């Protein structure tokens, strides 16, 4: 893959990924190293996300109607995402309109115009978005998981903010936040798809190299790592957290374990473990929970990864009367992995899991939007990131059963386990579940 990276004199990184195909599609976007974690203790919670909304409202050159009309006239797709650590703005469209799309993308990022009337209207929009998220059980459970594992740190607060904090964000807050964090040495511009680098480079360079880095001291959350790890180490017995979701026809169960700060070193092993448990219908959880017992339609396991800490999650949905039985079966499969040693993992499971991970990586390179997401997130989270697919695949191929077994023993400890349940539950089901489960 033709992957090119350049750094302007002001520190802004440019990433270009021309894709050799006949499909006239191009995607482009900005990644900024700021999210809700940067707000903690210094800025109003939710301002990163609020600013993301406002960037699409209008520029000093165009009203929102003009912006959206021009984008829609090309048939472009456009959106933005705020996470705990990053904010991304992107659009994709027919590469025949690349000049127009690039002009709009640069205008949105470089010339935002925060008008008071727009701010008040968008405040209401965000309040409605809050209601939508509150009605989604998985979102509510994820917030609760963060509150439990990341107490008194930046990861304990919501990306969208609270009702009170959103009510109090004003124009001055937005302008200060933009000038503080939207600076070149904290930003990456990325373009992927059917385009020629030489035809767009001069325009991009001339617009972005004008940006200067301010002298503001931005907030950092890197010091939180030891605090989070210490909180995780304090837990000495499993706990259950119940949430009554009376409108749900199923109960969502999330069985979680702390990964501490191990993902950065053992990420591949943890990803293989995840695939052994839930990768495809031949996985251990799919076999027992769906194919053999019919207890669930879907099951999944995955790591929630942040800078300095991570959590391993097993997520399953059960009928209310099957919660206890379902959790028991999940624990039984974890027991087998822990107690049967490296040889308890079959060659077939290792090969399948590694191939699934490789396939997932390769699928990132089919669609230009996925390409900018892959390279954007990797570059913004690791300023020294180097793309080497062969090296990545070679490392996967050299993983052993012993490697996966050792990380399994390390992170899947029942005394550190927290189970979150959202559904139609009675008050004593939590104690009943813990009484019924056997833990070593």
Swiss-Prot record:
InterPro entries: Metalloenz_LuxS/M16, MPP/UQCRC_Complex, Pept_M16_N, Peptidase_M16_C
Pfam families attached to this UniProt entry: Peptidase_M16 (PF00675), Peptidase_M16_C (PF05193)
EC numbers for this chain: 3.4.24.-
GO molecular function: metal ion binding; metallopeptidase activity
Binding site for Zn(2+): 49, 53, 129
Entry keywords, A to Z: Hydrolase, Metal-binding, Metalloprotease, Protease, Zinc
Stated family: Belongs to the peptidase M16 family.
Name of protein: Putative zinc protease L233
Organism: Acanthamoeba polyphaga mimivirus
Lineage: Viruses, Varidnaviria, Bamfordvirae, Nucleocytoviricota, Megaviricetes
